[in-house]
């Protein structure tokens, strides 16, 4: 496949830079209760961010030790440093697009904080989202180069809730094209995402971009979607907490679907506390998503409050133990099994009763817990295009009939896909729904849901424990073993860090709980996490140099909190070079295409816009401009 790179450059004017600087200078000097103060404000520095949790970042922001601008610049610096090839590493290729408005949004949120306004529990926190979440200010590609300029008018419900809670949407992450492959992340829009624990290995999929990015410290947390393993798989293989909630607890409105019978939205984080916090923001009824009618069955407002390091005491947990065959292409079976055995002993040490579940067999999973999805993919994608107000790429809809409607077939006809021919054939074999085959599959899946619910009751279980993946990440494969349990039945599941093999490959413990017992599952997960603390950050993406605190000017806020930033027009694309990144040998080769964060506003390690604000207020800036560089490549 040949690639023609496109580069789009968005330049902010000197006036915009000045406004941002003044807004930030206001944010750095909160008003005294007795009027103006002449005392210097505390120095602000860009903090170390490797494994910085959301709760850690909030504490720094609340104390005034850092600002959202400094924090955002720090994360953008990491994307710039590690996403494209560097040193002897191929780079992660985890980000499709860094938000050109991230720094200006951060400055606005800093000003709001200084003025005493806090939007919500994520105020000023940068968050990553998978590139199938619609965003009003950035294109949504679902990993397809053909959708490079597909721009929705509105945010997805999940992104809307993040923004309402005060989050900064930092970047859109790479994904398996149309979320199809769950063992690797490869897209025509960005190429292959690599695992930061060993960049020769797969990052799993389909949310591998979010997984690799969060693991590497591009942001404290991110969102993925999961149809069968796409949150828990990348989380297990990159030592993260990956939470797949009860089906219907979180809205999927505005997310490019794969199979709506199984699609969920959920968090990928470095701590259980952060996962619980994000679930409080994401969970809840959405009138545009009928499946969320079940969201009101549980109180999702106290997930964090309910976390306890004694939650496992007295819990009855079934340990699923199957025999597996050694496969040279999927290494680590023996060591992963030992790690999961130890994880289960750790559950017991925290007071859980571990019981065998001999009736939870392969046959029970394959014959009873069946999927009703994968017969609705093509029609569901077509429905998304038909019902989502968006600007389509020029000429794309006219490639197939009907010429006035954008369809999955149009995207495939454009010829830029990384999907295999047999994948495309399977998508397009899906008949319009309803149809008899689909109705029969749904009926069988509904019966499996009842059987799963009854299994928990009959065995008096609070949870099931199993390996997220029985084997380790490899160059061509990093999958899951038990994704069917949550995906096909809709019960909540979580992958938790369970240690590392002798080769440094991460392992994950998967827990599944009864339907709508999300609070209990999060609490049990927290107890296990606090007792084990397995997570270690990857060595291939170390902390960047941290500068000494930068003295900040003293000023009173002179303006009301700034409005939501508008999207700036972008310049015409220009060509850039395309780095070559190894792709899995068993899958179509596609080079990782260059991305870019917002350009640095100073030397490496400075506080970016904070330093710019200081220079502006001090009168030494003149006509400075911020340059936001966006580089993505389109296949042709």
Give the residues covered by each predicted segment.
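Short, well-ordered alpha-helical
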Residues: 37-141, 145-148, 179-182, 294-295, ...
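Glycine-rich, small-residue loops and helix-cap segments
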Residues: 64, 124, 422-549
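Short glycine/serine-rich loop/turn segments
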Residues: 85, 122-265, 290-293, 320-322, ...
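Short helix-loop capping/hinge segments that flank enzyme active sites or metal/cofactor-binding pockets
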Residues: 123-142, 311-320, 375-450, 497-506
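Gly/Ser-rich, acidic/histidine-flanked active-site/gating loops
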Residues: 133, 264, 291-378, 382-390
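Structural helix-boundary/capping segments
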Residues: 216-321, 346, 488-553
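Extracellular Ser/Thr-rich, low-complexity/disordered mucin-like segments
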Residues: 577-614
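C-terminal membrane-anchoring or membrane-association module
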Residues: 613-636
């Amino acid at each position: 496949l040949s690639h023609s790179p496109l580069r789009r450059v968005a330049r902010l004017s000197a006036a915009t830079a000045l406004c941002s600087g003044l807004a930030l200078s206001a944010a750095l000097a909160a008003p005294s209760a007795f009027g103006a103060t002449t005392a210097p404000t505390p120095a602000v520095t860009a903090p170390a961010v490797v494994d910085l949790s959301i709760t850690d970042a909030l504490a720094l922001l609340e104390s005034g030790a850092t600002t959202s601008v400094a924090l955002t610049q720090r994360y953008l610096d990491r994307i710039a440093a590690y996403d494209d090839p560097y040193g002897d590493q191929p780079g992660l290729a985890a980000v499709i697009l860094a938000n050109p408005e991230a720094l200006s949004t951060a400055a606005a949120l800093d000003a709001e904080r200084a003025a005493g306004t806090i939007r919500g529990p994520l105020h000023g926190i940068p968050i990553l989202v998978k590139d199938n979440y619609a965003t009003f200010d950035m294109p949504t590609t679902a990993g397809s180069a053909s959708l490079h300029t597909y721009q929705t008018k509105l945010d997805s419900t999940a992104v809307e809730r993040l923004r309402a809670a005060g989050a900064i949407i930092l970047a859109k992450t790479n994904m398996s094209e149309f979320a199809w492959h769950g063992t690797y992340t490869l897209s025509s829009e960005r190429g292959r995402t690599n695992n930061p624990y060993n960049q020769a290995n797969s990052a799993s999929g389909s949310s591998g971009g979010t997984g690799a990015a969060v693991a590497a410290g591009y942001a404290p947390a991110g969102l993925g979607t999961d149809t069968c393993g796409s949150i828990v798989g990348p989380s297990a293989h990159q030592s993260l907490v990956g939470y797949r909630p009860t089906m219907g607890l979180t809205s999927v409105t505005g997310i490019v679907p794969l199979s709506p019978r199984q699609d969920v939205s959920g968090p990928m984080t470095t701590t259980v506390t952060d996962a619980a916090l994000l679930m409080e923001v994401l969970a809840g009824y959405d009138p545009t998503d009928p499946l969320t009618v079940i969201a009101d069955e549980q109180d999702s407002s106290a997930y964090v409050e309910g976390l306890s390091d004694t939650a496992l005491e007295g819990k009855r947990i079934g340990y699923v133990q199957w025999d597996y065959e050694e496969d040279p292409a999927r290494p680590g079976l023996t060591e992963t099994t030992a790690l999961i055995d130890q994880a289960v002993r750790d559950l017991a040490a925290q007071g859980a009763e571990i019981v065998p579940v001999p009736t939870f067999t392969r046959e029970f999973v394959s014959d009873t817990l069946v999927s009703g999805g994968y017969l609705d993919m093509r029609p569901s994608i077509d429905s998304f295009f038909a019902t989502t107000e968006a600007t389509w790429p020029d000429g794309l809809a006219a490639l197939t009939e009907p010429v006035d409607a954008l369809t999955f077939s149009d995207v495939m006809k454009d010829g830029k896909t990384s999907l295999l021919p047999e994948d495309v054939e399977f998508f397009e074999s899906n008949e319009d729904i309803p149809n008899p085959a689909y109705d029969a599959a749904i009926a069988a899946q509904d019966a499996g849901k009842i059987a799963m619910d009854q299994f928990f009751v009959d065995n008096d279980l609070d949870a099931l424990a199993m390996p997220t993946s029985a084997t380790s990440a490899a160059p061509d494969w990093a999958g899951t073993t038990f994704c069917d349990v949550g995906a096909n039945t809709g019960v909540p599941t979580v992958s938790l860090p369970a240690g590392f093999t002798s080769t440094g490959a991460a392992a994950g413990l998967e827990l599944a709980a009864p339907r709508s017992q999300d609070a209990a599952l999060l609490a049990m997960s927290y107890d296990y996490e606090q007792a084990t603390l397995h997570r270690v950050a990857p060595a291939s993406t170390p902390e960047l140099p941290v500068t000494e605190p930068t003295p900040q000017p003293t000023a009173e806020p002179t303006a009301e909190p700034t409005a939501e930033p508008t999207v700036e027009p972008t310049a015409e694309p220009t060509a850039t070079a395309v780095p070559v990144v190894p792709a899995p040998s068993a899958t179509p080769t596609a080079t990782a295409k260059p991305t870019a964060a917002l350009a640095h506003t100073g030397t490496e390690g400075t506080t970016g816009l904070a330093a710019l604000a200081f220079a502006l207020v001090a009168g030494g800036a003149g006509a400075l401009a911020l340059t936001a560089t966006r580089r993505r490549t389109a296949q042709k």
